[in-house]
Design a protein with these regions (language model features):
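Basic, glycine/lysine-rich polyanion-binding surfaces/domains
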Residues: 1-138
């Protein structure tokens, strides 16, 4: 769960494909001034991991994401490669991990920008299976 503002929370499911976490939350009773706003159809969710992830972001994001400046579970609503984005640091065990959420219409553009930035650090896409392995280690 990430606090975006005083009255707004963002709840991300875990990376387990069989998780029913979000469905359980959707079925819970909520207060009169509370409502859910599903973002699965409007947002993409990317993850950048690794010891040089924060340095890589310095090429495409104005927020200082280095570990001593941007704590685990911190959130920033900012722009990444000129696309509006939410960046959440959510380490997987001892591996630095940054979740990037942006409008689905910017997904391909942002993906290309992140891949380009990763190349300088010998990084590249790894897929969800690798993310699950990192989460299991933590």
């Amino acid at each position: 769960m990430v606090r975006l503002s005083y009255h707004e929370l963002l709840i991300l499911s875990n990376i387990d494909p069989l998780s029913t976490q979000i469905e359980r939350l959707d079925s819970m009773a909520v207060g009169p001034q509370t409502y859910t706003l599903p973002r699965a159809d409007s947002h993409c969710w990317l993850a950048v991991t690794g010891s040089q992830a924060a340095e890589m972001f310095s090429k495409v994001c104005g927020v200082d994401l280095r570990p001593h400046k941007f704590a685990n579970n911190a959130v920033a609503q900012t722009s990444v490669a000129k696309a509006s984005a939410i960046v959440v640091r959510h380490d997987l065990g001892t591996t630095h991990c940054f979740y990037v959420l942006t409008d689905v219409s910017a997904a391909e553009f942002l993906w290309d920008c992140l891949i380009d930035a990763m190349l300088e650090y010998d990084g590249g896409p790894v897929g969800v299976a690798s993310m699950r392995e990192l989460a299991a280690e933590g």
